[in-house]
C-alpha cells in the first residue's frame, strides 16, 4: 500500500502554516507540548532544529500537502553509540487518523537505514 504521507525537513517555508496549525491545536497539545505559535518562536525552533545533532521533519498528507504533524530526531550521538531520541505531535484536525503512525514508520526507517543509527528512543 502506498504511504499517505510525505516526510520533509522543516524549513522556513513552513512558518506560516506551522504557526496556524500550532494555534489551531492548542487544546490538543496542552499540557504536553507547546509548538512554536509565533514567528519568533518558530525562528528559534528552526534554528535549534538546524543544529547537526537535531532533525525536524514535517509530516504532510500526500494527497493535499496539508501539514499533519512534526517528528523530531534529536540529541543525535554518532560514534560507536549511534543513538538519538524521537518525539512527535500531530496537528488538529489530523490527529487520530493514522498519519503520524505512518510518519513514525518512515522516520524509523530513515533513522536506521539513512542515518545508520543503532538506537532510537
Across the structure, where does each feature detected by a protein language model lie?
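GNAT-family acyltransferases
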Residues: 1-93
Amino acid at each position: 500500500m502506498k504511504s499517505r504521507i510525505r516526510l520533509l525537513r522543516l524549513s522556513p517555508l513552513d512558518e506560516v502554516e506551522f504557526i496556524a496549525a500550532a494555534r489551531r491545536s492548542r487544546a490538543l497539545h496542552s499540557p504536553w507540548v507547546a509548538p512554536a505559535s509565533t514567528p519568533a518562536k518558530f525562528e528559534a525552533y528552526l534554528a535549534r532544529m538546524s543544529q547537526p545533532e537535531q532533525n525536524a521533519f514535517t509530516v504532510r498528507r500526500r494527497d493535499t500537502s496539508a501539514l499533519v504533524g512534526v517528528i523530531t530526531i534529536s540529541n543525535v550521538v554518532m560514534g560507536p553509540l549511534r543513538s538519538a531520541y524521537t518525539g512527535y505531535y500531530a496537528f488538529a484536525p489530523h490527529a487520530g487518523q493514522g498519519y503520524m503512525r505512518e510518519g513514525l514508520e518512515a522516520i524509523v526507517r530513515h533513522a536506521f537505514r539513512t542515518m545508520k543509527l543503532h538506537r532510537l528512543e
